[in-house]
């Protein structure tokens, strides 16, 4: 089995090293095409205004000056001589749950793999800030991901569907199994931090405020809160079929879908 790895935290990220160790429990034919620099929050974006620069680090290890989407495209269409059987994107430093999935470059890696016709999974590891430092328990995903992936790889997923895996912030022995979930809802509370440079010109940082939401049972955020691995099936089709009839009636037509 051939596996292509990517991420959005960059080629030197600890999560990518963890993902490689996970992948090597499944296959010895593991390829990496990951961004040269951190591409967090770029979602499913393409580089169309600048050329892509590919750097070979070692055999089957490449860094690309581009987005996670660029990396998957380059990996499948340029770097690898034979199409991979599996695309793994991650392991992200921090969970990708609720509305996070719309911003996530990690999710985008799995989206692009799916669009290229390859079974794809996104993996993310929740963490805790302690005394101003980010403490990421990589050992959780490293312990539990291999067996979980072995079970999930045999699934006959519908075309256009991929899986979003999130691992809880706890000790490996505290993980209370895996749960199939749906997306939850968290308020982002994004804030704009206005500053001035040394010449008095304004510049701005986006930052997250306190996040709040209802941790409804069955959602990804509820699963993580209760030390469960969240497995959420996601699909490329963004059509809201529940309102197509109403939209059609508003336009004076019959049902269209």
From Swiss-Prot:
Q: How is the cofactor bound?
A: Binds 1 divalent metal cation per subunit.
Q: Which GO terms describe its cellular component?
A: cytoplasm
Where do the coiled-coil regions begin and end?
Answer: none
Keyword Lipid metabolism listed: no
- Indicate where this protein resides in the cell: Cytoplasm
Where, in this chain's numbering, is a divalent metal cation bound?
8-9, 40, 92
An example Pfam family from this entry, by short name, is SurE
Keyword terms of this UniProt record = Cytoplasm, Hydrolase, Metal-binding, Nucleotide-binding
Main subcellular location:
cytoplasm
Q: What is the protein's name according to its record?
A: 5'-nucleotidase SurE
Instruction: Tell me the organism.
Output: Rhizobium johnstonii (strain DSM 114642 / LMG 32736 / 3841) (Rhizobium leguminosarum bv. viciae)
Task: State which gene encodes it.
Answer: surE
């Amino acid at each position: 089995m051939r596996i292509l790895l990517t991420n959005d935290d960059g080629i030197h990220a600890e999560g990518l090293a963890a993902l490689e160790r996970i992948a090597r429990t499944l296959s010895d034919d593991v390829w990496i095409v990951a961004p040269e620099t951190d591409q967090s929050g770029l979602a499913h974006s393409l580089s169309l205004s600048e050329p892509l620069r590919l750097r070979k680090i070692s055999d089957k290890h490449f860094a690309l000056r581009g987005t996670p989407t660029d990396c998957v495209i380059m990996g499948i269409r340029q770097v690898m001589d034979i199409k991979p059987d599996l695309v793994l994107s991650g392991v992200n430093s921090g969970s990708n749950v609720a509305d996070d999935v719309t911003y996530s470059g990690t999710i985008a890696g799995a989206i692009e793999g799916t669009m290229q016709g390859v079974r794809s999974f996104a993996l993310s590891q929740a963490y805790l800030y302690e005394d101003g430092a980010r403490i990421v328990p990589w050992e959780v995903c490293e312990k539990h991901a291999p067996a979980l992936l072995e079970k999930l790889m045999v699934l006959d997923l519908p075309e256009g569907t991929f899986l979003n895996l999130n691992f809880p912030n706890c000790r490996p022995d505290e993980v209370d199994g895996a749960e199939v979930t749906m997306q939850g809802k968290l308020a982002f509370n994004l804030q704009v931090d206005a500053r001035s440079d040394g010449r008095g010109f304004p510049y701005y940082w986006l930052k997250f405020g306190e996040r709040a939401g209802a941790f409804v049972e069955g959602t990804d955020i509820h699963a993580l809160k209760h030390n469960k691995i969240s497995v959420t099936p996601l699909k490329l089709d963004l059509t809201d079929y529940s309102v197509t009839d109403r939209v059609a009636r508003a336009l004076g037509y019959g049902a269209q879908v």
